[in-house]
Amino acid sequence: MLRAQKLHSLKSSDITAILPTEQSQKLVLAKKNGDVEVYSRDGNTLKLFQVYPDLLQNAKNDPLPPVIENFYFANELSTIFAQCKETLILLSTTNLHEYDRIIDRRGINHCWLFERSHKNKEEKNTYLIYSTINTAKMRVLIWEGRTYKNMMEASLSYRKETIRSIYPGETGITLATDLGIYHWPYNKPSLIRIEKTVKNKFPKDMISALTELKEQAEKVIEKKPKKNSHFDAQSFSSMDRMSRKSSMSSLWYRTIRNERGNKIRYTFELDGNDATPMIIDGATKKIFKVELMHNNEEPFLIATDHATFSESNSEFDHMQYLSSNLLMLYNSSTIKFVDYENGFTFLQQKIPEGIKWVKNLSGTYFLVWTSNDEVQLFSYHVDDGSEDDDQESICGDINDPDFYQLWRKVLFYKFFIDSPHSKELCVSDNPEESLDICAMKLRDLTVMWCLRIFDKFQNYMVQLERSRNSRMIRSKCEEMIIKSIFDLFIKFWAPPQLVILKVFPSAISSLVLEITGQEHHCLLKEAEEVKETYDIPPHLLNRWCLPYLTDTRRHLQNLLSKENDDESRITWCYRDREIKQSFDFFLISNHDDVDLNTMLTLIDTVLFKCYLYYNPPMVGPFIRVENHCDSHVIVTELKIRHMFKDLIDFYYKRGNHEEALKFLTDLVDELENDNTDQKQRQKIDHGVKILVIYYLKKLSNPQLDVIFTYTDWLLNRHNDSIKEILSSIFFYDSQACSSRDHLKVYGYIKKFDKLLAIQYLEFAISTFRLEGNKLHTVLIKLYLENLDIPSTRIKLKSLLETTSVYEPRTILKLLNDAIESGSDQLPTNQLNFVKYLKIFPLSKLENHKEAVHILLDEIDDYKAATSYCNDVYQSDSTKGEELLLYLYSKLVSIYDSNRNSKLILNFLQDHGSKLNSAEIYKNLPQDISLYDIGRVVSQLLKKHTSKMDETRLEKALLQVELVATTYKLNERMSSYGVLSDSHKCPICKKVISNFGTDSISWFTREGRNIITHYNCGKVLQERFNAKNEKSSRIKQKTLGEVINELNNK
């Protein structure tokens, strides 16, 4: 635990006040004769630094200088407050020069000084609070930073009311007196007496829940006749362990001193941002949490039993909160460090000279002012070699000291690691390594402690099994304990073998022996003695136990993924510690080791059984992901429950495809027996068919032979549904199907149905977006063989037009062969269709002139030819213009032969604007009608003129925009601001020098120029951005909300 060591002591007679100042490492002593001695702390020693004779008389030349009764130090103000009978004297910390006084003729009784930070404020606030003599008045003076802000005064309820403790919280000051508890808001001049006290209906933590169950179990036992049961033996088995320190004389001595603790009402706040005031009340033996409401409701107290703490520490009448849930208690002879909730002692130091006053210093030091005016400096540190079986340090059931010692160790190591001074507490050459070891020790102790708690909890639940009283509270306690235990198991990475054996139901815990081969008799010895057992209810096991298994599984998987690395370790984090751990961290000490794969098998198999017994819908999803389950357990359990779909999913995930399909095909014979009627046989046969199809459709190309084999089995057994079976297996959009050899599949399907085989090619090409051209070539051949079907012609045209995967030269050869072979057999329309199809491969080969030749000369389709040329022009205007001129020349040739100018005139009217006019007129036939050509030329001129006008207009608009933009730029560049010699940066409040070389930032905000330093400008910009973002998130009020506001006014 902790051990204190006296480092130094000094003796000075007639001391009236002591003040250690952390800032300057000084110790100030006030004496009865008015002298003030200042000692300097040099390491672990105190040396006299300076003496101020008659300090206060020299300061103000008073005839009767006041006697200093106490000192208070304000670090933020760099001020020492000296309390006298009617005066608070403000002294500078540098030379103890008096610079101000606070005088109250009513007399100053007690004084408190606090410094604390508030939310959203950078500077600390200083609170000086004092009560007056013989009046019920309280006064508080408040400084924000170094600036005095406010003074408030309020009255207590009764004249002779005594203040026990005070603490300034976030919203106000909490006062605890001998007659009540008050809240004093910072913005109000009156105290609010807290009258309302409530108690939690249900236990708030694991230990209080266990205590509640214990009390219920004791009531049940009292009602039953006495039996020599295992539980009775366990309850009284430790009676003979009572130590000498817990003898009757010790208990009597504690009873006599009990009145001191009754006067304590100590107010403090725990560490953390959302901490609320806590009050330890020795009179009621309770601890109160002050709940401060923010909607104008009065505050109230939440009471929790604190009797164990109060009774164990009743002889102490002074308290100070240190950190990490640790309190320092002291009386006239002893100092104790205890945890605030349970009162476990972590340090106990006797002071033979007697104690007047104890003050905690920064770090791991405290100062003691003894009864003989000696000042002693102590340090404290962790001493792992100290006695841990000290019964006097245990607060709890004396009949089970082992459990409470374990609990005490858990709390101690938690305090040690959480402490802000953990490195100073650690006496080691390598404190970081020692703290890591202590963190792992805390882990081991916490797991052991949780298992002990579960043992007790299990015993109590067995005793309460048939009791009908307080079932709701019992249910809440049950969930609280299980949740808390498994939260700690997750946090501390508890060894899975240990947890499964000790906590999980026996049907699941038996897997440890079955999978690892380890019996663990030492762990199961106590459980074997108990005939009645308790199993965690399914809803709690699902909610709190399964996350532990999944989290442990994740850690082991991470280790497995790093198994081939040089350092196979993962990081366990506790607080600010990050400790690299290997697989050994998950094993039980002093037991035969298991390997990582076996441990993963155990975890996954336990998960499977938990899902199977308590959450069956999760079995399927778990089976279908990568897992390490024991195959024998999975197959056996799923077969027993006829969960065949999940079983074949398991086979599939493991890659045991033939085994899975053999199981399915043999299943028909296994399920059919002599008593099965025809209808039932058909139902079984249909079910097996569905499962085999479901399995086959998931297999990929490496298992293609397996697919064909078991598809044959299906087709032989169900020859009346060949098309349905083939479609279900092969026409499936999945990654597995897309990777198959589609030509092999096509050949297989073709043996049974040629039309279905063509449909498969269409499905494969359209669904899987295949890049190879073999399937396309095969499909186009098949289409060309069936041109007499209209739908086939549509598909063929669509395939050639929209697909770019096929090889154009191969397809062109196929089309030429079709034309040559079918020139005498094919009807004219089909022959022209095949010729038309040639334009698609020719287009891909960029043989556009040949395509135009086919369209115009062979098919005689002028519209198709011009459309083709226009498409080429849209994609490439140069090639398109060349192709249009080629088409134009062919049209001129046609005119020469038939003297029909209609095609030329239509072409020039539609596409003349795309061509060079000189080329048009050069090739224009000489004998064409001037009247006809005049109209076309007129339209061409209009189009050219319109295009020229559009170009001029666009140019003018761009010039206007350029002028406007140039004007704005010049206006911006000509703006200026006057920077005077006294101009201060609005952010840092420092003068911006005119002669400096530093960069400055210039903002214009709401018509006002703001000039700052460059770096300050970044801060200002962030504020502007945050403000804009906040305003953009403000919800706009609706009309109804505005009307309601007006009505309320």
UniProtKB/Swiss-Prot annotation:
<dbReference type="Pfam" id="PF10366">
    <property type="entry name" value="Vps39_1"/>
</dbReference>
<protein>
    <recommendedName>
        <fullName>Vacuolar morphogenesis protein 6</fullName>
    </recommendedName>
</protein>
<dbReference type="InterPro" id="IPR032914">
    <property type="entry name" value="Vam6/VPS39/TRAP1"/>
</dbReference>
<dbReference type="GO" id="GO:0016192">
    <property type="term" value="P:vesicle-mediated transport"/>
</dbReference>
<dbReference type="GO" id="GO:0034727">
    <property type="term" value="P:piecemeal microautophagy of the nucleus"/>
</dbReference>
<dbReference type="InterPro" id="IPR019452">
    <property type="entry name" value="VPS39/TGF_beta_rcpt-assoc_1"/>
</dbReference>
<comment type="function">
    <text>Required for vacuolar assembly. Acts as a component of the HOPS complex that acts during the docking stage of vacuole fusion. HOPS is an effector for the vacuolar Rab GTPase YPT7 and is required for vacuolar SNARE complex assembly. It remains bound to SNARE complexes after vacuole fusion.</text>
</comment>
<dbReference type="GO" id="GO:0000324">
    <property type="term" value="C:fungal-type vacuole"/>
</dbReference>
<dbReference type="GO" id="GO:0034058">
    <property type="term" value="P:endosomal vesicle fusion"/>
</dbReference>
<dbReference type="InterPro" id="IPR000547">
    <property type="entry name" value="Clathrin_H-chain/VPS_repeat"/>
</dbReference>
<keyword id="KW-0472">Membrane</keyword>
<dbReference type="GO" id="GO:0006914">
    <property type="term" value="P:autophagy"/>
</dbReference>
<dbReference type="GO" id="GO:0007033">
    <property type="term" value="P:vacuole organization"/>
</dbReference>
<dbReference type="GO" id="GO:0030897">
    <property type="term" value="C:HOPS complex"/>
</dbReference>
<dbReference type="GO" id="GO:0042144">
    <property type="term" value="P:vacuole fusion, non-autophagic"/>
</dbReference>
<feature type="repeat" description="CHCR">
    <location>
        <begin position="730"/>
        <end position="896"/>
    </location>
</feature>
<dbReference type="GO" id="GO:0031267">
    <property type="term" value="F:small GTPase binding"/>
</dbReference>
<dbReference type="GO" id="GO:0005737">
    <property type="term" value="C:cytoplasm"/>
</dbReference>
<dbReference type="GO" id="GO:0005085">
    <property type="term" value="F:guanyl-nucleotide exchange factor activity"/>
</dbReference>
<dbReference type="GO" id="GO:1990816">
    <property type="term" value="C:vacuole-mitochondrion membrane contact site"/>
</dbReference>
<keyword id="KW-0653">Protein transport</keyword>
<comment type="similarity">
    <text>Belongs to the VAM6/VPS39 family.</text>
</comment>
<dbReference type="GO" id="GO:0000329">
    <property type="term" value="C:fungal-type vacuole membrane"/>
</dbReference>
<dbReference type="GO" id="GO:0006886">
    <property type="term" value="P:intracellular protein transport"/>
</dbReference>
<dbReference type="GO" id="GO:1904263">
    <property type="term" value="P:positive regulation of TORC1 signaling"/>
</dbReference>
<keyword id="KW-0926">Vacuole</keyword>
<keyword id="KW-0813">Transport</keyword>
<dbReference type="GO" id="GO:0099022">
    <property type="term" value="P:vesicle tethering"/>
</dbReference>
<comment type="subunit">
    <text>Component of the HOPS complex which is composed of PEP5, VPS16, PEP3, VPS33, VPS39 and VPS41. HOPS associates with phosphoinositides and the PX domain of VAM7. Interacts with VPS41 and VAM7.</text>
</comment>
<dbReference type="GO" id="GO:0035542">
    <property type="term" value="P:regulation of SNARE complex assembly"/>
</dbReference>
